[in-house]
Amino acid sequence: MLTADAHQHYQPDPDVLRGRVIAVTGAGSGVGRAVALAAAAHGAELILIGRTVSRLEEVHSLIAALQRSEASIAPLDLERAIARDYDELAAALQTRYGRLDGLVHSAGLLGSPAPIEHYDVPTWCRVLHVNLTAAFALTQVLLPALRASADASIIFTSAGIARRPRAFWGAYAVSKCGIEALSRTLADELEHSGHVRVNALNPGPVRTRMRAQAFPAEDPSQLLLPEQIVPPYLWLLGPASHGVNGRSLDCQPSGERA
């Protein structure tokens, strides 16, 4: 029987993701990088999606050094990508792998803290596009590959601000509220597919560049490293979470803030 916090205390077997093909956006840094490396260390074959090729190449080299699995790089600038870019990525994935067992959305933009009354419209559009619209577009084109898997998992990275929006969080808060809605809507649509489950994860306070940008006065030494909050991602990507669908979960017990 699954407990409410089973995902937070998950201790995966070394080969829990062996043979699975998993795509991660934002794989060049932060939580996305940590999830990609952890999934590879547990046997998954990775598709590293991100904007900065040099960072993706670094992660690719680290995965190769593990000698546990393989990885491929799929450069994609979510801010500027058009429909053809998504289609080409999906076609290349289908040709090489034939299926997709996991899709982790970790790429994101913070935007600028400002009241709605004065929020910069171009910044608003950029944040909503990268954090929400791009996640929708990529999921849509990859659904056929996910349906080809016997047990596929989609993970949308949410935030505490999605559940309790607060002043001055602007487009970021709205985008994360949208991610929660997108996750639950898609989960309900796929409820009876039997093959694809969809959930959202809130990493909580983590030592990343985005966190430092949002809370410049915060002591980063008091925050967990991205590597320390990946077990819930591995839990949702693997067989231990079979049947878990439409949930919004916290990586940390506090379920805290942004």
Enumerate the language-model features and the residues they cover.
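Active-site loop of short-chain dehydrogenase/reductase
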Residues: 20, 68-69, 99-101, 146-159, ...
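Conserved glycine-rich Rossmann-like NAD(P)H-binding loop of the short-chain dehydrogenase/reductase
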Residues: 44-58
